[in-house]
Amino acid sequence: MKSIYFNEEKEVKIEEIKEAANGIKEGKLVLFPTETVYGIGANALDTNAVQKIFVAKGRASDNPLIVHISNINMLEQIVENIGEIEKRLINKFWPGPLTIIFNRKSENIIPNSVTAGLNTVGVRMPSNEIARELIELSGVPIAAPSANVSGRPSGTNVQDIIEELDGKVHYIIDGGKTIIGLESTVIRAVSYTHLTLPTNSLV
């Protein structure tokens, strides 16, 4: 398989993003930019599609994936409860490079392949225009780890990763070099006085 390449660096072409979004709905993989690093995305509600991510990256299946959303309605569909402290974090940092750990819905709308069987799920709303448009047009949350073969550096531009991932994903969306160049900060609100906040792209 030869990946379909879209160059959106200078101008976002909505028809091309729509084609890639349709690919997501069909269970295909899309390499796309965020403000942090590039990601390999699949429909987060489709177990078979998610499994393709692990194959493409050579990633262990016990390593959970971050779910990317474009609006709060998507979040409410997949998590059990949004507490007051999470709402404050969302209002302050979303869209942006913050992943928040939530309890996932007991109905397991998000499959175990995304969460590695955990009862929690990491979710973020990217600020990158292309990423948000891709998610919105696909109409589903997108599970997406960093775009690289496991053990290799995360990709901050397509040129760094195209050789190792071309043919492993159906679509490659080139949005130029990412702004931040680090993975998102991951946080879990344990209580109002205790936040788990590692040093990363927010600080």
Where are the regions a protein language model picked out?
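Single conserved hydrophobic/aromatic residue that forms the stacking wall/gate
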Residues: 194, 199-203
